[in-house]
Amino acid sequence: IVGLKPFGDESDNDMYMSSDDYAFFLTKGFNIYYNDYLRGDFVSVRTFDNYISLANGNNAEQCGMNGFCSNQFVVEGDGSVYPCDFYCTDEWYLDNINTLSFSEMYRSPKCVEFIKSSFKLNEKCKDCKYFYLCRGGGCKRNRESSDYCDAYKQFFLQSEDKLKQLKK
């Protein structure tokens, strides 16, 4: 199954989608979603639901699509706590729930840095007409991985008006 590159993977491998392939996937998938919606046969697709919300001036409900992180504490079986399920790594280990409260971890320098680091924005995003939809690649883990910027631009170019037409 062809998929998107995992974050941090810079390899050139045929098992990962190219930017053009990903643009095709997004556009084709959204057109199916859109046509089903118009026929009254709506099935929620979280990514598209969130793009509709963003296109209509609202926030996304999925934390990663707002362009910055929020704390989504993950507690492992041994009590280890991390700020997000995508960052259960030694680097982002906050503490153990048996020794420190959530509010103490929330105010910890490491947790504050986790959130602060998510606001870093690529220079090319600052003047992009689709920033209000893309939010600089959304979740910071997506910004760390291979660049699908062109895919999103192609998708938004073809779908922006339809996204604005649908309201949740």
PLM features: what roles do these ranges have?
Residues 1-68, 74-77, 86-97:
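Radical SAM enzyme [4Fe-4S]-AdoMet core and its adjacent flexible, acidic
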Residues 88-168:
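Flexible mid-to-C-terminal extensions adjoining Fe-S/redox cofactors in radical SAM and related proteins
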